[in-house]
A protein has these predicted regions:
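N-terminal Rossmann-like dinucleotide-binding module
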Residues: 2-53
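Donor/substrate-binding cores of folate-linked one-carbon enzymes
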Residues: 32, 98-207
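Conserved acidic residues
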Residues: 43, 93, 114
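N-terminal glycine-rich "phosphate-gripper" loop used for MgATP/nucleotide binding
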Residues: 47-48, 71-72, 76-77, 90-106
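Short, structured coil segments at secondary-structure junctions
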Residues: 61-62, 112
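Residue-level detector of anion-binding/catalytic polar loops
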Residues: 64, 93, 142
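Short beta->alpha connector loops at strand-helix junctions that form conserved
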Residues: 66-71, 119
């Protein structure tokens, strides 16, 4: 059986960011673009919440900001089809999830296979899901951290791109651990996007190789 191989494009790319809240990772990516570190432009900032602070930030920065209320749609599939239409209209190369609190449907995942990136505040495959910083504390983990990965049909199970570890301190709370992990998120997410548009990411099966 031939193994599927994907190599990211070496080009000036077009990014769509999906967010549900403040979008601090969106800001980190955009600031890396403005500094010249990432060879891309953010062509769409999308949210499922019209009041999301990240949308306001996008508008203040002169970026194309769009929101769609999920309620009028019959189901998740129809909602994601509407999002995909917005993405197609802008000829997007990479979708970045930045605190987007809705699960991407399998149809969306398949259409943009190896072109949807996410960041997770734990060292995957340990602690998928929500409230993972508290889980790391409760389980007595000595280290936690964050992971960038491509989005697959199974939640938090896509190919891992980069990881950064932080120690879990004995007096850590969910808030203090989250804050230290967030600092690392703001480093490895822009770095992952940079590598993508330098044509340096190769995916073979479920493994990522940096070229």
């Amino acid at each position: 059986m031939t193994e599927d191989v994907f190599i990211s494009p070496k080009k000036r790319g077009r990014i769509a960011v999906l967010l549900s809240g403040r979008g601090s990772n969106f800001r980190a990516i955009h600031e890396a673009i403005l500094s010249g570190a990432i060879n891309a432009d953010i062509s769409l900032v999308f949210s499922n919440k019209a009041e999301a602070a990240g949308l306001q930030t996008a508008r203040e920065r002169g970026l194309d900001a769009v929101s769609l209320d999920p309620k009028p749609f019959a189901d998740k599939e129809d909602y994601d089809k509407a999002i995909v239409q917005e993405i197609r209209k802008r000829d997007i190369d990479l979708v970045c999830l930045a605190g987007y609190m809705k699960i991407i449907t399998p149809t969306f995942c398949r259409e943009y296979k190896n072109r949807i990136m996410n960041i997770h505040p734990a060292l995957l495959p340990a602690f998928p899901g929500l409230h993972v910083q508290q889980k790391a504390i409760d389980w007595g983990a000595r280290f936690s951290g964050c992971t960038t990965h491509f989005v697959a049909e199974e939640v938090d199970m896509g190919p891992i791109i980069l990881q950064s570890a932080v120690p879990v301190l004995q007096d850590d709370t969910e808030e203090t651990l989250s804050a230290r992990i967030l600092v690392e998120e703001h480093k490895i997410y822009p770095e992952s996007v940079r590598l993508f548009f330098e044509g340096r990411i190769e995916v073979r099966g479920r493994r990522v190789f940096i070229r």
